[in-house]
């Protein structure tokens, strides 16, 4: 009886987990809370685009803000709403700067999507000029038919590299009275509009919508919105917490939040330092000593000289041969705790190429303190030179 | 250009990754096929349907000693289908790929695995081809009409099409990118890397789960405009106890082996913490450890342990100062296969310091050895000293003039020494090499004459015959990487050479031809 109840609870819990996971993985759901409140970027953008659709004019706007603030989600929601309101009056062309920053490629993609929207056959062989011409013709035709074309340019800053031919031809075509188009640029570079050339900038309406990371209050609301289940089931962020959800109890406990937090706040370099063998630590300490002696540059041979002198002075048991030390040195290179100082002399033997530390002496000292197997000599070697 | 690039490995893994038990592709001849590595077997296993018995979580954890927390993390983060991207990172040989593939096998029903080891796919084009061929239902051969996209935009479109087809049937697809760190050094890696890391945003398919495996830390992938971070799972290096557990795994005589490990593991662990290197060193050592024992099944008592320890102690000291070279998997298998051959190689490995010189038998002609030595001298000695060292009298005892060691000159000498250490072996023109070569061969001509062929044609016909021979051998030495030939100097126009051998090797070569090398080396 009790076992059956527990099994039922577990299945409910796993269902709940599935619901929550699905929700957290979906951008649209995460940011749909923004829809309800007035005076957000959502309502501003919607007003802007809707008015240019209904008044049949051209417009352009930039959405700027760091990643994860819901720029693309807002665009999606606005476009969804508009498609519902004016089903025949808009067509959307989406480009991504990461994929279509090349002008030829971008015009081809625009032509392809235009053909798809208007049930025209798309020719793969068309030249870039043909495609540009086709785009301008389509803009005119759509303008005459009172249809708005909305261009969504994600990663807008990447379109602003090079000659910016695409942006120019697009914005120039929008200068004519017949056309009817909206360009929405999305970028996480706040200076994206400064990247534009003069001829492009003058054709661009300087509307910008700034996205900032949500405040604590709105985050709290967002959390409630995300984690509250649809029906009032007995069950009460982020993805990781939900993944750590305890299936047996079916509760998102404080513990799961703590676990998730601790696994997200890692310091990769410190972790890497904890993984080193004693010999590798010796080499790092020797390098640190060399840096403290204000050597401008040093290589493996100089490190070995320092290592030998340390071993001679302290007579430790960790005295290993040249080749073994070199293998440890290579491990350090692999772990990217040290690296070559320059890219010159690629044909030179590795021993002689100058190297540098990629960690600070503070990090090294801390990791030695945390390391329980580390010999006391090492600690002393590191400390002494600091107070001298 | 339109020829699609499909590396052999990908076609094979695509054949094994398709869910139906596909027959081995008949195109690849079975004889030329290399032995499957454990990783590839694992890959095939991850793609194959799970066995009825061995698919419980406990069995999974038992196969991953010391990786319990990580395996649980992976399972939790991947498990019910929609999942955010995941990145596993940690040093080499910490079981990242193994844990991932085993976890995926555990999750097996209703999922599809697409695995791309970026190290074996040398270019974006090959990567695209591999991914798409693994996704397409019919493994596409090199002559198929499919065109491999080489632009990122075409690739993402093709990938989305292929994935849409699978996802619409309700399947979950796991895209695994192994060895992500190598992309950074690719030709267009700077553009490809953000593309790979943002694939989740670009595809917008929740049923497609992206997993990255990297030995570089996450901060290696930060870019200027950033990207939404994947969930990280960190794989730390194994601790001593975990390494012991791994090594003890399935050992025929656990008592004996654990007594061996208690002696040998700790000191070696101070040098390296990588399991693959440790096991490579420990295997021959254990064989050495067992030598006094007649019966390998014996359970050692205290007295026996002490005796064995004393026996192995000297070998342990040698092993500590030897390079841990990890043998190729295939050659390791060979050693295991042929018992006698394995013992032979182990003996050679532990022949000790004095044995090294006998091991070092390159089949090299005497004049090539002299050439090597003269190249070594030319690289190490400053050119200005040549006249003093290789005087016509052959002696170098006439270096009597000793400068006063004032403070300034001492300091200057120090900086020169420093510079020499930093610069490494110097380069030299061909003329200098030949001059030194002639000097040292003339000094030890008597030795050369003894060894020379009975006809003695070369020495009689004068230097011209010798020279042509020398040039030939010089190119041989360059090809075998004893010497390296640098670019020709723009002013002088002739190529410069540099010797790559270290002092130990040079001394050994000198000993083999009875040449007093140390007399000619400039000591600082």
UniProtKB/Swiss-Prot annotation, chain B:
Sequence ranges of Low complexity compositional bias: 1-19, 39-49
Source species, domain of life: Eukaryota
GO MF annotation list: ATP binding; DNA replication origin binding
Stretches for region Disordered: 1-56
One of the record's GO cellular component terms: nuclear origin of replication recognition complex
Expression triggers: Reduced expression upon sucrose depletion-mediated cell proliferation arrest, and accumulates after sucrose treatment.
Residues annotated as binding ATP: 90-97
Subcellular compartments: Nucleus
Pfam families cross-referenced by the UniProt entry: AAA_16, ORC5_C, ORC5_lid
Compositional bias annotation for Pro residues: 20-31
Gene Ontology BP term (one): DNA replication initiation
Gene3D superfamilies hit by this protein: 1.10.8.60, P-loop containing nucleotide triphosphate hydrolases
Expressed in which tissues: Expressed at low levels in the shoot apical meristem (SAM), leaves, ears and roots.
Alphabetic keyword roster: ATP-binding, DNA replication, Nucleotide-binding, Nucleus
Main location: nucleus
Complex and partners: Component of the origin recognition complex (ORC) composed of at least ORC1, ORC2, ORC3, ORC4, ORC5 and ORC6. ORC is regulated in a cell-cycle and development dependent manner. It is sequentially assembled at the exit from anaphase of mitosis and disassembled as cells enter S phase.
PANTHER family: ORIGIN RECOGNITION COMPLEX SUBUNIT 5
Sequence similarity: Belongs to the ORC5 family.
Function per UniProt: Component of the origin recognition complex (ORC) that binds origins of replication. DNA-binding is ATP-dependent. The specific DNA sequences that define origins of replication have not been identified yet. ORC is required to assemble the pre-replication complex necessary to initiate DNA replication.
The protein, known as: Origin of replication complex subunit 1
Organism: Oryza sativa subsp. japonica
Chain's gene name: ORC5
């Amino acid at each position: 009886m009790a076992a059956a109840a527990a099994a039922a609870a577990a299945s409910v819990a796993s269902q709940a987990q599935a619901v929550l996971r699905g929700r957290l993985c979906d951008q649209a759901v995460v940011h749909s809370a923004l829809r309800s409140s007035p005076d957000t970027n959502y309502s501003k953008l919607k007003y802007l685009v809707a008015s240019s659709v209904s008044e049949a004019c051209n417009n352009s706007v930039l959405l700027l803000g760091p990643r994860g603030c819901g720029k693309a989600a807002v665009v999606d929601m606005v476009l969804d709403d508009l498609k519902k309101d004016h089903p025949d009056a808009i067509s959307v062309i989406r480009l991504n700067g990461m994929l279509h920053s090349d002008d030829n490629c971008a015009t081809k993609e625009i032509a392809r999507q235009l053909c798809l929207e208007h049930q025209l056959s798309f020719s793969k062989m068309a030249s870039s000029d043909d495609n540009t011409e086709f785009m301008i013709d389509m803009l005119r035709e759509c303008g005459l038919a009172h249809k708005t074309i909305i261009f969504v340019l994600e990663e807008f800053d990447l379109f602003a590299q090079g000659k910016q031919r695409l942006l120019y031809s697009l914005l120039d075509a929008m200068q004519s009275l017949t056309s009817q188009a909206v360009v929405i640029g999305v970028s996480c570079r706040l200076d994206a509009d400064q990247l534009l050339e003069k001829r492009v900038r003058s054709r661009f309406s300087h509307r910008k919508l700034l996205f900032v990371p949500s405040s604590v209050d709105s985050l709290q609301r967002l959390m409630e919105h995300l984690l509250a289940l649809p029906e009032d089931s007995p069950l009460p962020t982020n993805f990781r917490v939900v993944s750590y959800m305890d299936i047996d109890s079916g509760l998102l406990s404080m513990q799961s939040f703590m676990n998730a937090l601790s696994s997200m706040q890692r310091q990769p370099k410190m972790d890497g330092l904890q993984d080193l063998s004693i010999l590798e630590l010796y080499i790092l300490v020797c390098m640190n000593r060399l840096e403290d002696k204000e050597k401008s540059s040093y290589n493996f041979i100089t490190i070995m000289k320092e290592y030998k002198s340390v071993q001679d002075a302290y007579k430790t048991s960790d005295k290993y041969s040249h080749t073994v030390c070199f293998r440890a040195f290579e491990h350090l290179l692999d772990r990217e705790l040290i690296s070559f100082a320059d890219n010159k002399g690629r044909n030179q033997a590795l021993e002689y190429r100058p190297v540098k530390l990629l960690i600070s002496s503070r990090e090294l000292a801390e990791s030695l303190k945390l390391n329980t197997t580390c010999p006391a000599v090492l600690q002393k070697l590191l400390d002494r030179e600091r107070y001298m | 250009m339109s020829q699609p690039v499909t590396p052999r490995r990908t076609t094979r893994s695509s054949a094994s990754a398709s869910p139906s038990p596909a027959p081995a592709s008949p195109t690849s001849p079975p004889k030329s096929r290399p032995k499957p590595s454990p990783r590839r077997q694992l890959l095939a296993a991850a793609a194959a349907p799970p066995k009825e018995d061995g698919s419980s979580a406990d069995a999974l954890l038992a196969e991953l000693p010391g990786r319990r927390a990580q395996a649980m993390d992976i399972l939790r983060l991947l498990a019910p289908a929609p999942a955010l991207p995941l990145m596993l990172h940690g040093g080499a040989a910490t079981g990242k790929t193994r844990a991932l593939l085993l976890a995926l096998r555990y999750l097996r029903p209703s999922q599809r695995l697409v695995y791309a080891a970026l190290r074996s796919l040398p270019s974006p084009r090959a990567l695209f081809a591999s991914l798409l061929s693994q996704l397409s239902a019919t493994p596409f051969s090199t002559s198929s009409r499919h065109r491999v996209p080489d632009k990122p935009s075409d690739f993402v479109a093709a990938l989305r099409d292929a994935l849409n087809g699978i996802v619409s049937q309700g399947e979950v697809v796991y895209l695994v990118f192994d060895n992500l760190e190598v992309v950074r050094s690719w030709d267009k890696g700077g553009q490809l890397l953000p593309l790979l890391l943002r694939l989740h945003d670009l595809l917008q398919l929740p049923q497609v789960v992206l997993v990255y495996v990297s030995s570089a830390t996450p901060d290696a992938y930060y870019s200027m405009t950033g990207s939404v971070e994947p969930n990280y799972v960190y794989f730390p290096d194994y601790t001593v106890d975990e390494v012991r557990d791994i090594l003890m795994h399935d050992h025929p005589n656990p008592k004996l082996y654990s007594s061996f490990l208690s002696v040998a593991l700790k000191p070696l662990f101070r040098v390296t913490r990588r399991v693959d290197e440790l096991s490579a060193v420990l295997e021959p050592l254990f064989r050495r450890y067992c030598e006094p024992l007649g019966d390998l099944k014996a359970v050692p008592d205290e007295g026996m342990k002490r005796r064995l320890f004393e026996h192995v102690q000297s070998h342990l000291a040698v092993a500590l100062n030897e390079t841990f070279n990890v043998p190729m998997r295939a050659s390791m298998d060979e050693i295991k296969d042929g018992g006698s051959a394995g013992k032979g190689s182990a003996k050679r490995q532990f022949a000790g310091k004095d044995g090294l010189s006998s091991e070092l038998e390159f089949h090299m002609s005497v004049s090539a050895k002299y050439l090597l030595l003269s190249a070594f001298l030319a690289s190490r000695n400053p050119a200005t000293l040549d006249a003093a060292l290789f005087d016509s009298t052959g002696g170098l005892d006439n270096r009597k003039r000793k400068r006063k060691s004032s403070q300034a000159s001492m300091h200057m000498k120090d900086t020169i020494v420093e510079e020499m250490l930093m610069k490494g072996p110097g380069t030299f023109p061909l003329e200098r090499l030949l001059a030194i070569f002639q000097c040292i061969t003339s000094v030890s001509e008597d030795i050369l004459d003894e060894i020379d062929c009975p006809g003695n044609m070369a020495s009689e016909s004068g230097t011209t015959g010798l020279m042509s021979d020398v040039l030939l051998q010089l190119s041989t030495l360059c090809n075998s990487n004893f010497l390296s030939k640098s670019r020709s100097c723009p002013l002088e126009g002739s190529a410069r050479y540099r010797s790559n051998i270290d002092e130990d090797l040079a001394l050994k070569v000198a000993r083999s031809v009875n040449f007093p090398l140390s007399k000619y080396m400039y000591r600082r």
